[in-house]
């Protein structure tokens, strides 16, 4: 047993269009967590990976490509539209974000709300600032009992990072490079707030468990490694494989049998194979 007592899980705004079914599944998930003494961090929005999310049948995994099916929420197109003053999606998004926060505002099964993962990533930069400001405003209208956060290191743009540092109840950050881990902790400790590293552990960059865990313990910092089981998300492959995504899709190099998922010589993220 790894003795994990928490996990970080992403929701998606589009699922609010199937609210009743979504909430049934979310309740099942929270019940399973509670039975296993796990309190999750819940992530609402995300600027990373595929830019055009949709309901229905999802992309097949692309063989050997890191996170080939991961979809942004709400997606860069909508975020850019909001930045330009086109607000046609705001009502729908506001139904989702304050809606889920309000329903679970007093729920002791949830540890923390991570409102927006890595705003500014994947080339959008500070065009995400306007939407991020709205997300923070909506969250403070509800003001759930659980702490609120959005990461600092991991986000892109000075104004975005400044906003997250001002608003976050808990300082969260993402560090995958071994030489940056302890300096980042020392820098962020100046905020004098509880601190959690919500993403780390890239073997290729040196942030192995053996290297990282003593540092987190030394500074009393909570930590969440990326990845658990090497499955269809294939995050045991490195980020550089994302550059091959378009070519691999054109060649239809999809995983149609989950048993066909390949393995790199050295895993990037993840801990277990699918058979445990």
Feature annotation, model-predicted:
Residues 194-276:
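Substrate-binding cleft of secreted/luminal carbohydrate-active enzymes
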Residues 1-170, 174-175, 179-182, 191, ...:
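Active-site mouth of glycoside hydrolases
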């Amino acid at each position: 047993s790894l003795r994990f007592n928490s996990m970080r899980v992403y929701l998606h705004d589009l699922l609010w269009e199937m609210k009743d079914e979504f909430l049934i599944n979310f309740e099942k998930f929270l019940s399973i967590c509670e039975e296993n003494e796990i309190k999750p961090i819940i992530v609402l929005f995300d600027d990373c990976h595929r830019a055009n999310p949709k309901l229905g049948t999802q992309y097949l995994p692309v063989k050997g490509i890191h996170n080939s099916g991961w979809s942004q929420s709400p997606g860069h197109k909508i975020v850019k539209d909001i930045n330009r003053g086109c607000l046609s999606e705001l009502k729908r998004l506001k139904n989702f974000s304050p809606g889920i926060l309000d329903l679970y505002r007093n729920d002791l099964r949830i540890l923390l709300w991570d409102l927006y993962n890595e705003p500014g990533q994947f080339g959008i930069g500070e065009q995400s600032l306007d939407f991020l400001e709205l997300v923070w405003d909506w969250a403070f209208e509800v003001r759930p009992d659980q702490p609120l956060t959005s990461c600092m290191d991991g986000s892109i743009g000075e104004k975005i990072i400044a906003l997250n540092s001002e608003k976050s109840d808990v300082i969260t950050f993402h560090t995958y490079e071994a030489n940056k881990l302890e300096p980042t902790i020392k820098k962020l400790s100046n905020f004098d707030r509880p601190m959690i590293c919500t993403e780390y552990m890239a073997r290729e960059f040196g942030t192995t468990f053996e290297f990282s865990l003593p540092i987190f313990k030394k500074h009393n910092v909570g930590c969440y490694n990326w990845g658990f089981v090497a499955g269809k998300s294939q995050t045991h492959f490195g980020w550089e494989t994302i550059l091959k995504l378009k070519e691999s899709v054109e060649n239809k190099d999809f995983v149609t049998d989950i048993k066909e998922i390949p393995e790199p010589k050295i895993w990037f993220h993840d801990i277990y194979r699918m058979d445990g």
